[in-house]
Amino acid sequence: MDISDIGRKLSLDNNKLLIRKAAEIRRLCDAQFDSSIIGVGEICKAVICLEIAATRLQIIFDRQAAVKLSGMSEKAYSRSFNSLQNVIGIKIKLNVRELAVQFGCVRVIKSVQNVLSSYKERFLASLPASRRANADFTRPVFTAAAFYLCAKKQKLKVDKLRLIEVCGTSESEFSCVSTSMTDLCFDCVGISKEKKDAKDVKGNRDLLDVLPGKRRLEDGGYSSGDESSCYKRHKKMEEAKYEDWKSTVVNSIKKNPEKGTKRVIQASLNFPKKSETKELQVDS
């Protein structure tokens, strides 16, 4: 399907500049790699190229209609969109002020700028001198993580999934950067005055009890290698039940040793033997 046909289905066919830009991005994708390797079909690739072009030209783009047209789920579409952008080397420029206006959190602008400055300084200080020159803080995931943590600090609601979508990253990368930023800039974005262990926080303790083997570093969550308290209690209860049953059986055998030690022998079964058949010969 041609780019112009997809643009017509998304009501974007009137913008000739957008169609030309999307076609240019599609040719760049075809020249650099085979999109089928990352599971992106031709129609989905054309839709994603249109969205990338619309983003760069600051044109309003209906992502819901695009996801429906691509034939993929929203999560799979976002993953393919991010992969395609990274492969062709197109970087999203994320401005703190535009982000604050978009999410309605204008009062966090100054805080976000301070957190980004402190994080960069402290992160570079933790690196060896040979690696400091290669550190890249221009990626939008750092701005998005600082914005989210500052909004959370000031108890402002921000749609996390939408923010991840805007900055063009994955949930795992966003969570990793948020955790690193919280550790290095806890005085700026920390919720409490001091860090607490996961077992001391009721909400986190309940989460660890439910999923002892599948813990994620999400909002307020912490990972731990120890077994949860609920699992330990359950294990102790099972052991106690087993010990009670074992003591009951042992006491029963002590009271009736003959009954307990007597072996049960299966009676032999004697089936009647079949009568031997004799062949009858007829005299001719």
UniProtKB/Swiss-Prot annotation:
Signal peptide stretch: none
UniProtKB keywords: DNA replication, DNA-binding, Nucleus
UniProt subcellular location: Nucleus
Protein's GO biological process: DNA replication; pollen development
UniProt cross-references to CDD domains, sorted A to Z: Orc6_mid
InterPro entries: ORC6_cyclin-like_2nd, ORC6_cyclin_first, ORC6_met/pln
GO molecular function list: DNA binding
One GO location term (cellular component): nuclear origin of replication recognition complex
Gene3D superfamilies: Cyclin-like (1.10.472.10)
Residue spans crossing the bilayer: none
Induction: Regulated by E2F. Accumulates rapidly after cell cycle reactivation by sucrose addition following cell cycle arrest mediated by sucrose deprivation.
Main localisation: nucleus
Presence of the UniProt keyword DNA-binding in the record: yes
Tissue: Follow a cell-cycle regulation with a peak at the G1/S-phase. Mostly expressed in siliques, flowers, flower buds and mature leaves, and, to a lower exent, in roots, leaves and stems.
Subunit structure: Component of the origin recognition complex (ORC) composed of at least ORC1 (ORC1A or ORC1B), ORC2, ORC3, ORC4, ORC5 and ORC6. ORC is regulated in a cell-cycle and development dependent manner. It is sequentially assembled at the exit from anaphase of mitosis and disassembled as cells enter S phase. Interacts directly with ORC2, ORC3, ORC4 and ORC5.
Family: Belongs to the ORC6 family.
Function: Component of the origin recognition complex (ORC) that binds origins of replication. DNA-binding is ATP-dependent. The specific DNA sequences that define origins of replication have not been identified yet. ORC is required to assemble the pre-replication complex necessary to initiate DNA replication.
Protein name, entry field: Origin of replication complex subunit 6
Primary gene name: ORC6
